[in-house]
Each structure stands twice: as structure tokens, then as C-alpha cells.
Amino acid sequence: MEYFELMFKTAKELEESIVAILEDVDSIGIAIEDNFFDESILWDYIDKSFSERNYILIKAYFDRNVDIDRIIDKIRTKIKEIFGEAKVEIEYRIIREEDWTNKWKKYAKPIYLDRIVVLPSWEEIGNVEDRILIRIDPGMAFGTGNHPTTIMCIEMLQKYLKEGMDVLDVGTGSGILSIVAKKLGGDKVKGVDIDEKAIEVAKKNAEGNHVEVEFQKNDLIDGINEKYDIVVANLIAEIILKLNANVKRVLKTDGIYIVSGIVQEKLDMILNSLRESGFKLLEVKEKEDWYTVVAQNED
């Protein structure tokens, strides 16, 4: 199968908003590379500043049968509306699915945390001692464990999840957080994502890790009536803001709410939203300019 791969060179601080735009135009997969350099990409415009550390490469994937020129025009219009004349270079090419998969193998590395080791499915490893080993193949879904937001969510699950708790993972992507929750002793664990491809990948990853997790194609928490001890959502600020207004409906009393994918410019907005929704703020964690917030439902 073939896909369009769109590549965006942009300032690191624009990452969250660019990802939101890409999700809005129905991208089926997004990858983010820091300190990038790819000789196989021939850009129309090369600027020396793009090699500096504050620039990133965002890649988005679309089905081969879409009108890619129309999508690019829509993306450029949205970027101009939000950022004006901000520097964002866009190129695209056609790739095969196996090429996309092999690129993950180049950038995905083992992650060693307090109680957990996250390992790309194709990697071999020696003795992990008493750590929990989780193997992840992202396929066409977001989430290998390498991104700071994913790492922080895993750390917060390690801290707050007690054996027998029920966990809801909103925007599950590759299923990594759902699998972590189950491995840490979660009882009923459910992962939801609006992307059908992500659900397929998450199910395969759960099978590969020999855990039972329910994965469901869903728009955030629409139609979910069960209550959970923990809700974790590694999304972007604008979507978290929407989720904040209704998430108590699926949280038990004293339930823990973990949100990540927040840049500094949007942090106060999220904190104020949580306070207005009646949450008790427990902690704010930062890693590489990304923020994770943990709150508690006192209702």
C-alpha cells in the first residue's frame, strides 16, 4: 500500500498547533523528529536556521487516493490564519507502507523508566531485571514511547495507578499507555481513538504484549457511560480543553485525571479550565518544554 508523506519544517514552539491542523484534515499518522536531517528530501527552499535545535520536522501521512494538493492548500490557509507569515516549509512524496515502518526503526529507541522498559518490537534486549517489558510497534499510529509527553504519562501511571484500578486512555494511538496501565495492574482498561488505523495497531500491540485491553474507535468520551479510577489523555491543549468540560462524567469520585501534550503557552489555559471544572490540581510536570498535569475529581 502507498501513502502520501507530507513533511513540515517549522519552529519547535509551533508543533502543537501544526499537529492540531493535521488532525483536523484527517491525517492517518503523525511523526515528529527533533534535530532532523534527511538527505533524501529535496526542499524547494533551504534556510540555514532549519538545522538549529529549535526547529523540528513534522511528518504527516495520508491515503494515496486523497487530493493531496487540496489538502496542502487547506493546511497552508489554516497556518496563515493562525501564524501569519510564520516560517513553515511543506514538501510531500509518495512512500510505501514498509518504507514508513522502517523509518520508525531508525528513530525509536528503548526507553528505561523506573519500573518499565519500553522496547521497539524489532529490538532485542538482555536482562531487564525486575522491570516490566513492553514491546511497541507503532505501525501507522502515534506513540513509540520516545516522546516526552508519553514518557511523562507513563511516569504518572507508575505513580498513581494501584492494582485493580480501572483506566480509560483517551487518544490511545499505538495503545502504549493502555498496555502500560494493564501491565501495572489495571483491571478494566479501555483505549479509545478517533482513528480506525490506530485502533488496529493498538489491538496488535496488546496481543503482542499478552494483555487484554478493550480498544474502541470513538470521538473522545462520547457514548462512554462507565466510570474509571484514572483517565489519561495525551492529546493537545485544544482537545484537552474540550475534554475537561465532560470528563468528570467518566471519572469516579477521587479519580485521577492525567493530561499531557501541553506547551507552555497553553499551560495556564488548561490549569484554569481544570479549576473551573472543579478539579483539585495535584501536580504539574515538565520535560523538554512539554507539560503534563495531574488533577483529581473531588465530586
From Swiss-Prot:
Molecular-function annotations in GO: protein methyltransferase activity; protein-lysine N-methyltransferase activity
Report the sequence similarity comment from the record.
Belongs to the methyltransferase superfamily. PrmA family.
What are the GO cellular component annotations?
A: cytoplasm
Enzyme class (EC, first level): transferase
Classify the main location.
Answer: cytoplasm
Write down what this protein is called. Answer: Ribosomal protein L11 methyltransferase
Q: Does the keyword Membrane apply?
A: no
Localization terms from the record = Cytoplasm
Q: Looking at the record's lineage, which domain of life comes first?
A: Bacteria
Protein EC: 2.1.1.-
Function field:
Methylates ribosomal protein L11.
Source organism: Dictyoglomus turgidum (strain DSM 6724 / Z-1310)
